[in-house]
């Protein structure tokens, strides 16, 4: 490049010298092993960078969260739109969590006119308490002697009995007079003045009190004992069986064909089982069988005919 004048040539040379000077200094710093630090840079002169370094006794987490490790974009306030969006979401989520937690109702950040503050007031729920108030115990006087202790228990029993009687009396007064009419399980009592009057219903307590008022030792008082129980009917003795008359026994004589002693044994065995027979006699030689007992001739004949041939003895006339 050719210059038109000497002045322009000198100006060009001076500018080249100025540009070469910082390059030489930078090359010198590069040779020394680092970049030159500009002490007048506003980032270096920031107040947060001038804070003293953390002491070695602090936790490593606090040292890691110090401003020395803060990104450059955050320190310059040049956060990206994505980071701002995430921060807004976190803040909204934190607000919703704070609204749900019971501790947030009592936070000082809630204004006094808001509904959240009014709902968090514990006095708001005083009207909805449905439990009975706890009675305050009354200090009873100390009892030292045994007599005082007995008197104290008697007084308490009298008070309890009076309360019970008052409640029962008030209950009966509220009911109608014929409330217990269907529950009466006793008979009506006649009036003592007029025994022929209509029977009037009286309570058992009233009849008992009327008996107590009368003097048992007075001659007018008559006590009627309960009637004796009716006599039991005499036990009837069982009828005695009729005595057997010996004259009622009948004698039956039969002619039986007996061939041997075996035939006689069969007849004897059969007669022993016959009902009503008291005695019998077998004459083997004459072939004669005599039966005595409460039997009829036809019954004996029919029974023996089952074993052997038999017929009535000719001398006996059938009755």
UniProtKB/Swiss-Prot annotation:
One of its GO terms (cellular component) is nucleus. This is Protein SODIUM POTASSIUM ROOT DEFECTIVE 1. Zn(2+) binds at residues 260, 263. The gene is NAKR1. Residues 249-315 form the HMA domain. It comes from Arabidopsis thaliana. Interacts with FT, but not with TSF (TWIN SISTER OF FT). It comes from the Eukaryota. Residues 224-242 have a biased composition (Pro residues). Required for root meristem maintenance after germination. Involved in phloem translocation, starch accumulation and flowering. Promotes flowering in the photoperiod pathway. Regulates long-distance movement of FT from leaves to the shoot apex through the phloem stream. Keywords: Cytoplasm, Endoplasmic reticulum, Metal-binding, Nucleus, Zinc. It is found in: Cytoplasm; Nucleus; Endoplasmic reticulum. Expressed in vascular tissues of cotyledons, rosette leaves and roots in developing seedlings before and during the floral transition. Expressed specifically in the phloem companion cells. Not detected in embryos or seeds. Not detected in the vegetative shoot apex. Residues 1-13, 104-113, 200-210 have a biased composition (Polar residues). GO terms for molecular function: metal ion binding.
């Amino acid at each position: 490049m050719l210059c038109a004048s000497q002045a322009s040539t000198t100006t060009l040379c001076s500018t080249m010298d100025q540009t070469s000077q910082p390059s030489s200094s930078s090359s010198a710093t590069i040779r020394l092993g680092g970049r030159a630090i500009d002490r007048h840079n506003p980032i270096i002169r920031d107040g947060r960078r001038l804070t003293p370094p953390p002491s070695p006794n602090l936790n490593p987490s606090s040292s890691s969260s110090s401003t020395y490790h803060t990104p450059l974009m955050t320190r310059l306030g040049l956060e990206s739109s994505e980071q701002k969006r995430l921060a807004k979401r976190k803040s909204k989520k934190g607000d919703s969590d704070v609204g749900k937690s019971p501790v947030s109702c009592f936070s000082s950040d809630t204004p006094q006119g808001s509904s959240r503050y009014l709902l968090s007031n514990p006095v708001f729920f005083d009207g909805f308490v449905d439990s009975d108030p706890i009675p305050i115990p009354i200090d009873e006087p100390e009892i030292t002697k045994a007599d005082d202790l007995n008197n104290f228990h008697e007084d308490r029993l009298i008070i309890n009995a009076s309360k019970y009687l008052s409640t029962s009396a008030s209950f009966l007064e509220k009911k109608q007079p014929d409330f217990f009419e269907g529950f009466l399980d006793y008979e009506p009592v006649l009036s003592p003045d007029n025994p022929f009057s209509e029977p009037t219903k009286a309570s058992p307590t009233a009849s008992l009190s009327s008996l107590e008022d009368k003097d048992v030792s007075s001659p007018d008082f008559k006590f009627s004992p309960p009637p004796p129980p009716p006599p039991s009917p005499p036990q009837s003795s069982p009828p005695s069986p009729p005595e057997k008359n010996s004259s009622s026994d009948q004698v039956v004589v039969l002619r039986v064909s007996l061939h041997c002693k075996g035939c006689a044994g069969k007849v004897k065995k059969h007669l022993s089982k016959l009902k009503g027979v008291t005695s019998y006699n077998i004459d083997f030689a004459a072939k004669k069988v005599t039966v005595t007992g409460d039997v009829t001739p036809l019954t004996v004949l029919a029974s023996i005919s089952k074993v052997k041939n038999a017929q009535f003895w000719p001398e006996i006339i059938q009755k």
